[in-house]
Regions:
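Cytosolic nucleotide-binding catalytic cores of signal-transduction proteins
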Residues: 20, 25, 29-114
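Single conserved hydrophobic/aromatic residue that forms the stacking wall/gate
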Residues: 1-6, 10
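Coiled-coil dimerization/phosphotransfer module
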Residues: 15-16
């Protein structure tokens, strides 16, 4: 039980670090590499698995996937990425196409369970 509690604390600390990195900047490539490392360690290599299964995803697609997996809203993502809400809506639409999701499949649910 102690191990589980320690693991939860560790995951929480990593989450806080990731959020701090995102708030500072996600546009700097070095920061993105660090974010990716933290994200993969807390989400069972999510990005690696996603990249392996869907090799045509762009870096921007992967960023959106990570932010959606963190359960951020479209508005929050737009604010973090310094773009309009409409731009994120369009990226989500294109991402659904690249992931070949059915019309009734929720993008966030898909990413949470991936």
């Amino acid at each position: 039980i102690k191990s589980s509690a320690a693991s939860d604390v560790y995951k929480r600390q990593l989450y806080i670090r990731m959020k701090t990195l995102m708030e500072e900047t996600l546009n700097n490539q070095a920061d993105w590499v660090l974010f990716e490392s933290y994200f993969n360690s807390t989400h069972q290599n999510f990005m690696d698995r996603l990249r392996q299964r869907y090799s045509d995803l762009t870096t921007g697609d992967l960023r959106i996937c990570c932010l959606l997996r963190m359960n951020l809203s479209t508005k929050e993502i737009a604010s973090l990425m310094n773009v309009s809400v409409r731009a994120i809506e369009l990226r989500r639409y294109r991402l659904r196409k690249r992931l070949e999701l059915e019309g009734d499949t929720n993008l966030v649910d898909f990413l949470m369970n991936f």
